[in-house]
Amino acid sequence: MTSHPVFIDLSLDEQVQELRKYFKKLGAEISSEKSNKGVEDDLHKIIGVCDVCFKDGEPSQIDGILNSIVSIMITIPLDRGENIVLAYCEKMTKAPNLPLGKVCLQSLWRLFNNLDTASPLRYHVYYHLVQVAKQCEQVLEVFTGVDQLKSQFANCPPSSEQMQKLYRLLHDVTKDTNLELSSKVMIELLGTYTADNACVAREDAMKCIVTALADPNTFLLDPLLALKPVRFLEGDLIHDLLSIFVSEKLPAYVQFYEDHREFVNSQGLNHEQNMKKMRLLTFMQLAESSPEMTFETLTKELQINEDEVEPFVIEVLKTKLVRARLDQANHKVHITSTMHRTFGAPQWEQLRDLLQAWKENLSTVREGLTSVSSAQLDLARSQKLIH
């Protein structure tokens, strides 16, 4: 979302006077006379009635009025501006319809970008900004990812408690439209907890697991097990379910669902979607150890009919987690490469062996090139002597 700088030609006193007159004309309970207590008191009273303009008026006109209020707010010293900014942000969440909601969103974005990047007030503005963006279905205009979020607050990082509150909000506003982004947010949230307070993050940890399991684009779930709040769930059904998605095959999930059907459904998880993901994860695990698989093997392991194998493999290839070739004539699948579901000590050892083999091969090639180069040089010298 773009935002233009705030420039108002009138002086502060003139702006305050005009705003008071405007809102009084709209029927607001406010004096048209400027306060003798200073501009902060004027702003408090103006902001207190500013939502009266939501009842009538064109969005463009209201945008101009709010722009004027913002232009005054950003002149208030930091130590006296917090209550004013919070009051304004709260008013902006009260827009009665979508067009005015977008006006309020633009106004908050303008305020956010015109505050000093080192101002702690930017956090409060951004929090309300996300709330309004949700109302307007414009969340991705103000939040595109965790890295972008952190860069916004690089000069004044919020406290851990503030970030936890913000991450929870971001999870809530993205969970219905972008599960992948929502899952990343929850992982960041759990990462803010330490060993000392991870035990109080039970609800957040459960939400994180459920979001990751429900996301059709999240397949590598092993990192969740390392998060401290998730460790505190060991022994709980949700942790058992996560462990199945991390390292078990389809039959383990089927058995879990038969034993705990009500629990799975109570978490808002879709059984058919779970089956689809577990089939893919099972295929990945089979591909790690079997460079060649028959259709018959896949029908048994994945619990599908033989005529479903080809469409299934094609869907797997679309994820780019596995590279393979279908051999329809011989009813086989030839695996070229696959992502690992988990990456522990065995995978590190395999990677070490692979790199060592590459190193040895490169050394052999280098020695061969050196020999060829020396032979060519000797040949050139001998030909020169002959002539």
From Swiss-Prot:
Signal peptide: none annotated. Pfam families: eIF3m_C_helix (PF18005), PCI (PF01399). This is Eukaryotic translation initiation factor 3 subunit M. The gene is Tango7. PROSITE patterns: PCI (PS50250). GO terms for molecular function: caspase binding; cysteine-type endopeptidase activator activity; translation initiation factor activity. It is found in: Cytoplasm; Golgi apparatus. Residues 181-340 form the PCI domain. HAMAP family: eIF3m (MF_03012). The keyword Calcium does not apply. Component of the eukaryotic translation initiation factor 3 (eIF-3) complex, which is involved in protein synthesis of a specialized repertoire of mRNAs and, together with other initiation factors, stimulates binding of mRNA and methionyl-tRNAi to the 40S ribosome. The eIF-3 complex specifically targets and initiates translation of a subset of mRNAs involved in cell proliferation. GO terms for cellular component: cytosol; eukaryotic 43S preinitiation complex; eukaryotic 48S preinitiation complex; eukaryotic translation initiation factor 3 complex, eIF3m; Golgi apparatus; investment cone. It comes from Drosophila erecta (Fruit fly). Keywords: Cytoplasm, Golgi apparatus, Initiation factor, Protein biosynthesis. One of its GO terms (biological process) is sperm individualization. PANTHER family: COP9 SIGNALOSOME COMPLEX SUBUNIT 7/DENDRITIC CELL PROTEIN GA17, EUKARYOTIC TRANSLATION INITIATION FACTOR 3 SUBUNIT M. Its main location: cytoplasm. Belongs to the eIF-3 subunit M family. The keyword Cytoplasm applies. Component of the eukaryotic translation initiation factor 3 (eIF-3) complex. The eIF-3 complex interacts with pix.
